[in-house]
From Swiss-Prot:
Positions bound to Ca(2+): D25, D155, I156
Phenotypic consequence of gene deletion: Larval lethal. Severed axons in RNAi-mediated knockdown class III dendritic arborization (da) neurons of larvae, display decreased regeneration. RNAi-mediated knockdown in larval class IV da neurons glial cells also impairs axon regeneration.
Chain's gene name: Archease
GO CC terms of this entry: tRNA-splicing ligase complex
Key words, A-Z: Calcium, Metal-binding, tRNA processing
Name this polypeptide is given: Protein archease-like
Species annotation: Drosophila melanogaster
GO BP terms: positive regulation of axon regeneration; tRNA processing
Sequence similarity: Belongs to the archease family.
């Protein structure tokens, strides 16, 4: 669902992710000072693997929702919803994700996804992401140090 947003005071967050080699696939490692931020970083990293985010403008905002039975399935379904947003109309490639609801008791996420429709002439084509996997998925929470990390393997 498309939502209204204001470009005033619109800031992009610091990049807190990396890509790790994995046999025939790629592992995304996202981190942050909260679990919410680590999830957001992991989602942006997935888009960054599909195209160079420097070429993406923030023209539209869509809202997605994801539900799970535990944190791992919530992360899986969150990334799967983002992949669907890219793979079907509006073919949105996101430069910023803002989770507006992060309910870890009921395992629900609502997220504003900022970006624009993917265009071959404008956006360099990266590697196609076929699917999200549970393989070697990790969610690490160090509450005392305010350090949260997620590791997800995406099928390419």
């Amino acid at each position: 669902m498309e939502v209204e947003f204001s470009r005033e005071n619109f800031l992009l967050p610091e990049m807190k992710y990396e890509y790790l080699d994995h046999t025939a696939d790629v592992q995304i490692h996202g981190w942050g000072s909260s679990l919410k931020e680590a999830f957001e970083q992991c989602g942006v990293a997935m888009f960054g693997y599909m195209t160079e985010l420097d070429y993406v403008s923030v023209e539209q905002c869509f809202e997605i929702e994801a539900h799970g039975d535990d944190l791992e399935s919530l992360l899986f379904h969150f990334l799967d919803e983002l992949l669907f947003l890219f793979s079907a109309e509006p073919y949105l490639v996101c430069k910023k994700l803002e989770i507006t609801k992060f309910d870890v008791e009921n395992f629900e996420i609502s997220c504003h996804c900022y970006g624009e429709p993917f265009e071959l002439g404008k956006h360099p084509q990266g590697t196609e992401v076929k699917a999200i996997t549970y393989s070697a998925m990790q969610i690490i929470q160090d509450v005392e140090a305010s350090n949260y990390e997620v590791f997800v393997i995406i099928d390419i």
